[in-house]
Amino acid sequence: MFIISGRTMLKKAQQEGYAVPAFNIHNLETLQVVVETAAELRSPLIVAGTPGTFSYAGVGNIVAIAAELAKSWNHPLAVHLDHHEKLADIKMKVAAGVRSVMIDGSHFPFADNIALVKSVVDYCHRYDVSVEAELGRLGGQEDDLIVDGKDALYTHPEQAREFVEKTGIDSLAIAIGTAHGLYTAEPKLDFERLTEIRQRVDVPLVLHGASGLPTRDITRAISLGICKVNVATELKIAFSDALKNYLTQHAEASDPRHYMIPAKAAMKEVVRKVIADCGCEGKL
């Protein structure tokens, strides 16, 4: 089996003090880059897609390509549903072979968030599918979801304890000052809050919105309990900037087998850096 649950790899990361990178992908080329690079560095890997990505590329296509790449590189990985909100959608994708899920009910009141997440956990655990949920809200934009900065909410440590106990989730995404998208100024992460959450919660903790974070912040967050680091925007920008630059310099280019090469190379450098920041090279 090359498509696996995220549960075991996150528990190992928690025990050994590193983080597993979750890279958001969009198509064949971005999948190739993250699997190839992780395999070369023997890094654990989570390949993530938002609802928009699965709608664009097709869940069956993503699972099949990921499985074939994992097999060819002899590199097990998790295909992960990022920021999914509907149980019916999750059921369909689990049936298609996904084994790692994030249910996002963070926009609901606390009790409603618990009820939604528990329904997903009850279903997914029957099929050995790991479940991540979010408590608190990150600002910024993910797919079509836009959260204004004033609506972003930090995770409350005591609520985190209750949330984990009542839902039975496998990992918890927390809000400590990161945001989706690129930062216009260097964020100030609430490491004290992270420490307080870690003291109350025994499941692996997840950091969303890591694109553009300084290495020192990522490594400190990992030292305080973060076990999974999500990166999306930074990958897209590296890929698209290199592609645009190549096509600007080679106006006659028409073969995607050629003009995708520099785009993939630029994205690969970001993947290598994130793996280094996570301290997970050789940890497969």
Swiss-Prot record:
Pfam families to which the protein is assigned, alphabetical: F_bP_aldolase
Q: Does the keyword Phosphoprotein apply?
A: no
* Enzyme class of the recorded protein, top EC level: lyase
List membrane-spanning regions.
none
Q: Name one GO cellular component term.
A: cytosol
Q: Tell me which Gene Ontology terms the entry assigns under biological process.
A: D-tagatose 6-phosphate catabolic process; galactitol catabolic process
Q: Which residues bind Zn(2+)?
A: 83, 180, 208
Its annotated pathway?
A: Carbohydrate metabolism; D-tagatose 6-phosphate degradation; D-glyceraldehyde 3-phosphate and glycerone phosphate from D-tagatose 6-phosphate: step 2/2
Keyword field = Galactitol metabolism, Lyase, Metal-binding, Zinc
The UniProt catalytic activity note for this protein reads: D-tagatofuranose 1,6-bisphosphate = D-glyceraldehyde 3-phosphate + dihydroxyacetone phosphate
Residue numbers annotated as active site: 82
EC code(s) of this entry: 4.1.2.40
Q: How is the cofactor bound?
A: Binds 1 zinc ion per subunit.
Q: Which CDD domains match?
A: TBP_aldolase_IIB
Q: List the disulfide bonds.
A: none
Q: Give the required cofactors.
A: Zn(2+)
Q: What does this protein do?
A: Catalytic subunit of the tagatose-1,6-bisphosphate aldolase GatYZ, which catalyzes the reversible aldol condensation of dihydroxyacetone phosphate (DHAP or glycerone-phosphate) with glyceraldehyde 3-phosphate (G3P) to produce tagatose 1,6-bisphosphate (TBP). Requires GatZ subunit for full activity and stability. Is involved in the catabolism of galactitol.
Subunit structure comment from the entry: Forms a complex with GatZ.
Q: Which PANTHER family match?
A: D-TAGATOSE-1,6-BISPHOSPHATE ALDOLASE, D-TAGATOSE-1,6-BISPHOSPHATE ALDOLASE SUBUNIT GATY-RELATED
What protein am I looking at? D-tagatose-1,6-bisphosphate aldolase subunit GatY
- Species this chain originates from: Salmonella schwarzengrund (strain CVM19633)
